């Protein structure tokens, strides 16, 4: 144990930079990222990359249509090939480009052969995970041409995990394997693939859609870096999705608990497990924009003063409900306890849940991406095998902030806005950090915009009144502007 600690201490000055697919979508983006790495990193730092642009989606479509529509599959195949080759040709010198094209075409031939096999976990993961390999190899070659000593590394060489709905990294095995590469390339920037790991059989394991952030924090925790910066196409974390809400504003500081809850609620800006690997460490986490590095950022702070204030409105239009309706003779509390133990053991907690003791009903809300896999796992529990079903076409809208559920003003405003919406149920977190509504619709854009407008205007007045310390003025504003919500 002491040896491991000593090894980690040697790498404490290291930083890790993670770049998402939107930061690597075209030639200009790759050059921009190379400049950021040159300016913001030093020898020995780690760079984790996602697949370029929409490569992962293209690979999924290629695989999908290879079995049902060969003409369409051929179009996806050609699109992937030309996109990757175009990046290589335009970013590298002729000699280096020819070499990387050979590597790419060798990979591509391998994937074409795999498409002739039955599609199982092994084949699917091997094909879909290749975007990260191409991205890391190319990024490392670009850095070399920038005069930056670099080495690309396939994360499957050291990250170990087994197939499941939420693959968990074997930290002990992974740390031991990673150590030799850190020693070997201690004076280089290591460009590492995100999203992929390997199991004991040597098969590729995917760490979940948008799992590169999770890869980054996991690798950062394994190496004991002192700071992780996640770069994307937005400046940081906003009060709402800035692509949906024009008035959303940047949050320069967010508490660890608030960020963790945002991730748990499957917000697009944070992968659901991004914060897990670093929750018990002192690693700093920051979010910045690769398109405009100096515009601003969001820092995740371990301790922030609690003020029962709203920070974020988040939504997800692709969630499902797993429903378990027990028979009259079944002991509801006993079954519910067994389900909870199962979910805890497998770390597959729902986004929200509803328990109706009278109707012996349990509803568990998950993203569409993982719902089918979790339902399959739950159906293995013998006592609920015949009682379980899946309903889709739901959405989730939530407000997040430390102690938000104890602030009656925000709660009432939230409930009032949802009074005419098809609400399936409301739920709030145990720590009172989020209030959630699950809706039987998948169109929440207008609702989110209106909620943001009202809640953050209310926040503005709330802060103004506290500054003035005038209760009369405060309640006057509430009565005149928000009489509907009180």
Segments and roles (model prediction):
Residues 1-270, 275, 367, 438-440:
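Nucleotide/pyrophosphate-binding catalytic subdomain
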Residues 256-301, 306-328:
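A conserved active-site cap/scaffold subdomain adjacent to cofactor or substrate pockets
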Residues 183-199, 262-287, 326-329, 388-401, ...:
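Electropositive, surface-exposed helix/loop patches at the edges of structured domains
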Residues 298-486:
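A conserved regulatory-domain signal marking ACT and ACT-like small-molecule sensing domains
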Residues 15, 188, 226-227, 260, ...:
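Structural beta-strand/beta-sheet cores of well-ordered domains, especially the beta-sheet scaffolds
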Residues 150, 190-191, 285, 350, ...:
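Hydrophobic beta-strand scaffold residues
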């Amino acid at each position: 144990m002491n040896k491991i600690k000593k090894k980690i201490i040697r790498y404490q000055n290291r930083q890790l930079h993670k770049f998402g697919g939107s930061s690597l979508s075209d030639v200009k983006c790759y050059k921009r990222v190379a400049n950021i790495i040159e300016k913001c990193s030093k020898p020995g730092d780690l760079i984790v990359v996602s697949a370029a642009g929409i490569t992962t989606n293209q690979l999924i479509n290629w695989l999908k249509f290879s079995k049902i529509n060969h003409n369409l599959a051929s179009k996806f195949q050609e699109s992937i090939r030309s996109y990757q080759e175009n990046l290589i040709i335009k970013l590298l010198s002729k000699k280096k480009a020819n070499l990387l094209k050979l590597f790419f075409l060798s990979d591509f031939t391998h994937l074409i052969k795999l498409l002739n096999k039955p599609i199982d976990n092994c084949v699917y993961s091997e094909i879909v995970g290749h975007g990260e390999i191409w991205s890391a190899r190319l990024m490392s070659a670009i850095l070399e041409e920038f005069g930056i000593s670099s080495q690309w590394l396939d994360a499957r060489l050291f990250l170990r995990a087994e197939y499941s709905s939420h693959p968990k990294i074997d930290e002990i095995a992974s740390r031991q394997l990673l150590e030799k590469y850190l020693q070997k390339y201690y004076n280089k920037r290591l460009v590492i693939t995100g999203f992929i790991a390997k199991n004991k059989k040597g098969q590729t394991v995917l760490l979940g859609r948008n799992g590169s952030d999770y890869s980054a924090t996991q690798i950062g925790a394994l190496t004991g870096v002192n700071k992780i910066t996640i770069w994307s196409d937005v400046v940081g974390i906003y009060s709402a999705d800035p692509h949906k809400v024009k008035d959303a504003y940047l949050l320069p500081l967010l508490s660890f608990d608030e960020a963790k809850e945002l991730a748990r609620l499957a917000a697009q800006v944070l992968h659901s497990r991004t914060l897990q690997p670093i929750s018990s460490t002192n690693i700093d986490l920051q979010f910045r924009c690769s398109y405009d590095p100096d515009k601003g950022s969001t820092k995740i702070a371990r301790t922030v003063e609690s003020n029962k204030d709203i920070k974020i409105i988040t939504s997800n239009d692709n969630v499902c409900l797993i429903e378990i309706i027990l028979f009259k003779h079944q002991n509801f509390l006993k079954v519910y306890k067994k389900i909870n133990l199962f979910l805890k053991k497998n770390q597959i907690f729902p986004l929200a849940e509803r328990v109706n003791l009278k109707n012996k009903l349990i509803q568990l809300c998950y993203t569409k991406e993982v719902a089918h896999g979790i339902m399959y796992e739950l159906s293995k529990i013998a006592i609920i095998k015949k009682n379980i079903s899946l309903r889709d076409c739901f959405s989730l809208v939530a407000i997040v902030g430390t102690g938000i559920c104890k602030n009656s003003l925000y709660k009432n405003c939230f409930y009032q806005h949802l009074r005419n919406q098809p609400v399936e149920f409301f739920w709030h977190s145990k720590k009172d950090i989020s209030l959630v509504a699950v809706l039987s619709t998948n169109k929440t854009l207008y609702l989110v915009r209106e909620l943001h407008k009202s809640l953050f205007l209310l926040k503005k007045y709330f802060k103004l009144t506290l500054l003035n310390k005038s209760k009369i003025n405060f309640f006057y504003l509430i009565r005149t502007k928000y009489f509907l919500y009180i």
